[in-house]
């Protein structure tokens, strides 16, 4: 999934009626409807995640998909393409934070199906306003400034929708970096449970 780590991805060998078959670990887990969102959110990674979500929907539109997130965030447009696909497809998308879900990663974690958003005990979550920079003529800078304010408003409304927090609180909290522990994110409404053991979740 991440080019720089391709040589480090372990292979799994399975015995089939036709002999042995080797999978990389991510492809094997995809058979179990597990999708990994790891590292910075950018266009290539987002396209891979979207493609996997659409594939799993076509395989079985009535069975949950499990999205595991360990991400520092990244591109808003790339992240929103994943978010929109999660809302668009028929299967529920269960989200689970392992490590961190920061910025756009936190938005995607919160965007999972209600009652099916989880994190592990030592997860770290971060919400904040979108970052951006632009150089050019004053008029163009003004155009981009207005656009990033619209993006901030859109993201705040998404967080308010999924957390149940008032939009005013979301606006206040995202004005600066707002870190949360697993238990704090549960109280905030970003997740529905903090998991400690495998028995608490099916996958």
From Swiss-Prot:
The record's section on InterPro entries has: ClpP (IPR001907), ClpP/crotonase-like_dom_sf (IPR029045), ClpP/TepA (IPR023562), ClpP_His_AS (IPR033135), ClpP_Ser_AS (IPR018215)
Q: Which residues form the active site?
A: 103 (nucleophile), 128
- Return the EC number: 3.4.21.92
One term of GO molecular function: serine-type endopeptidase activity
Alphabetically ordered keywords of this record: Cytoplasm, Hydrolase, Protease, Serine protease
Q: Which CDD domains match?
A: S14_ClpP_2 (cd07017)
Highest rank taxon of the organism: Bacteria
Show the GO cellular component annotation of the record.
Answer: cytoplasm; endopeptidase Clp complex
What is catalysed by this protein?
Hydrolysis of proteins to small peptides in the presence of ATP and magnesium. alpha-casein is the usual test substrate. In the absence of ATP, only oligopeptides shorter than five residues are hydrolyzed (such as succinyl-Leu-Tyr-|-NHMec, and Leu-Tyr-Leu-|-Tyr-Trp, in which cleavage of the -Tyr-|-Leu- and -Tyr-|-Trp bonds also occurs)
Signal peptide (from-to): none
Q: Does the keyword Hydrolase apply?
A: yes
Tell me where it resides.
Cytoplasm
**The keyword GTP-binding is assigned to this record:** no
One of this protein's GO BP terms?
protein quality control for misfolded or incompletely synthesized proteins
What the protein does comes down to: Cleaves peptides in various proteins in a process that requires ATP hydrolysis. Has a chymotrypsin-like activity. Plays a major role in the degradation of misfolded proteins.
Question: Which NCBIfam families has this protein been placed in?
Answer: clpP (TIGR00493), PRK00277.1 (NF001368), PRK12553.1 (NF009205)
Concerning its family, UniProt says: Belongs to the peptidase S14 family.
- Known PANTHER family for this protein? ATP-DEPENDENT CLP PROTEASE PROTEOLYTIC SUBUNIT (PTHR10381:SF70)
Q: Note the subunit structure.
A: Fourteen ClpP subunits assemble into 2 heptameric rings which stack back to back to give a disk-like structure with a central cavity, resembling the structure of eukaryotic proteasomes.
Protein name, per record: ATP-dependent Clp protease proteolytic subunit
